[in-house]
Amino acid sequence: MDQDAFILKEDSEVEREAPGGRESLSDVIGFLDAVLSSEPTDIGGDRSWLHNTINTPQGPGSAHRAKSEGEGEVSTPSTQDNRSGEESRVSGRTSKPEAEAHAGNLDKQNIHRAFGGRTGTNSVSQDLGDGGDSGILENPPNERGYPRSGIEDENREMAAHPDKRGEDQAEGLPEEVRGSTSLPDEGEGGASNNGRSMEPGSSHSARVTGVLVIPSPELEEAVLRRNKRRPTNSGSKPLTPATVPGTRSPPLNRYNSTGSPPGKPPSTQDEHINSGDTPAVRVKDRKPPIGTRSVSDCPANGRSIHPGLETDSTKKGIGENTSSMKEMATLLTSLGVIQSAQEFESSRDASYVFARRALKSANYAEMTFNVCGLILSAEKSSARKVDENKQLLKQIQESVESFRDTYKRFSEYQKEQNSLLMSNLSTLHIITDRGGKTDNTDSLTRSPSVFAKSKENKTKATRFDPSMETLEDMKYKPDLIREDEFRDEIRNPVYQERDTEPRASNASRLLPSKEKPTMHSLRLVIESSPLSRAEKAAYVKSLSKCKTDQEVKAVMELVEEDIESLTN
């Protein structure tokens, strides 16, 4: 119902324009055919053509009608702009009155006034957007000069035939206008919309992309032919001077990287050549404008636009690597790492091999690879040396432990030897020297510690007979009644054994002595004497305290005196 109301409104406008006689109906009929060929659901499609200017090569165009009509009426091109669902601004030769008329035609309030109250919930004005629900950016599409996008088939065709751009320029076909400005905000109702709120947030319709509504069939064919041959980048890499060598790239304007200034859209050299009467058209980029223009200027592989500089620098680096190797070899030789430069060039070690390859690298990727190999080989060599050092330290530790065991056993053996030696020395000291001190320390003669009497001829013991007392000989008298002069002849001293015969040898001590010491005999003499018990105990005690022979002699003299006094 809304579509019929739209068409009836357009027919009434055509009837009013026909009596004027200023324009033929052929342009309007072609325009209506394009309107009827589109579906109402395609109204919210791409409207990038709203911001493009088509210079009609004919004399008076449909835009001249819009100039003569009032601001309250909707002209034929503006109505078609609203119905086609594409943002393509179609006008004649641009001028300030035409821009004002076009801005007035796109006013949203005028569109509602032209439709009247016959629109429903699916009306064209609602499909065109209300200004707040649309996804239009504040800057007009492609104002910063992004690469144009299109159908993938056109992209592949243009990639296969890169010479079509030059053919279009030779045929005088329109060139795309980079960084064009938006619609002027000169209407009262257009300040909020600016002609851009008519693009809703719906998905892009690829079927309506190539449809351009123009007042001239010849211009339509030229624009369609131009759009078909135009390079696109919707599904492939952007065409750059590095990827398309056959096409001469126009130099970029200085406003392409930061956006064009208002009122002065940048243009290329080819646009200056064809800017006379050549129509220009621009298709909206399907990609949202992000970043800056400098991103699309660089190829995808990251290389420079001028590969000649890198090639020259690479060749220069290849020429310099020989001198670098010589300098490195000289440095290693001076540091003492290697013996000579020939060793660095001919060494088969992994570190030296990667070092030579790193110095001979032609680019940074190869150099990075070789440097990584050098680091890993050096790390592996260091780890191997660390393992060798660990094994060596382990062997040294085992050797030290074995040395400790050997030293411990040797110490024990040495202690045993020392103990045996000391026992032998003590035995020898007992053999060769006396334990106590002698009185005559001045004597130079050596006195043995053990004295053995020389062997004597023993007299046969005769049994005592009382008849012997009759003999004059006192030899057989008992000791108790023997005279004192015979006591000096006792050959067995008590404490100090004097050797009256120095001829006695040192081995005589080994001979058993047949005569015992007389200390026990002296005690028996005292106990058998007629003295009292107290005197006997006193003499025995004093005898046990004697230290020398003189003391023993003095004690025995006292004992004898007491006995004599008692007997007498």
UniProtKB/Swiss-Prot annotation:
Keywords: Chaperone, Coiled coil, Phosphoprotein, Viral RNA replication
Family membership noted in the UniProt record: Belongs to the respirovirus P protein family.
Role noted for this protein: Essential cofactor of the RNA polymerase L that plays a central role in the transcription and replication by forming the polymerase complex with RNA polymerase L and recruiting L to the genomic N-RNA template for RNA synthesis. Also plays a central role in the encapsidation of nascent RNA chains by forming the encapsidation complex with the nucleocapsid protein N (N-P complex). Acts as a chaperone for newly synthesized free N protein, so-called N0, allowing encapsidation of nascent RNA chains during replication.
Processing after translation: Phosphorylated by PKC/PRKCZ, and other unknown kinases. Phosphorylation is necessary for viral transcription and replication. The N-terminus contains the majority of phosphorylated sites. Ser-249 is the major site of phosphorylation, but is not necessary for most functions.
Segments of this protein annotated with the region N0 binding: 33-41
Gene Ontology molecular functions: RNA binding; RNA-directed RNA polymerase activity
Region (L protein binding): 412-445
Protein name (record): Phosphoprotein
Organism expressing this protein natively: Sendai virus (strain Z) (SeV)
Additional information: The P/V/C gene has two overlapping open reading frames. One encodes the P/V/W proteins and the other the C/Y proteins.
Stretches for region Multimerization: 344-411
Record's compositionally biased regions (Basic and acidic residues): 7-20, 83-101, 150-168
Coiled-coil regions, chain positions: 364-429
Subunit structure comment from the entry: Homotetramer. Interacts (via multimerization domain) with polymerase L; this interaction forms the polymerase complex. Interacts (via N-terminus) with N0; this interaction allows P to chaperon N0 before encapsidation and form the N-P complex. Interacts (via C-terminus) with N-RNA template; this interaction positions the polymerase on the template.
Biased composition (Polar residues): 50-59, 191-206
UniProt modified residues of type Phosphoserine: 68, 125, 192, 249, 257, 260, 447, 449
Residue numbers spanned by region Disordered: 1-23, 38-320, 496-516
GO BP annotation list: DNA-templated transcription; viral genome replication
Interaction with the nucleocapsid (N-RNA) as annotated region, ranges: 479-568
Domain topic, free-text comment: The N-terminus consists of a long intrinsically disordered tail. The central part contains the coiled-coil multimerization domain (PMD). Forms a four-stranded coiled coil structure. The C-terminus constitutes the alpha-helical domain that binds to the nucleocapsid (N-RNA complex).
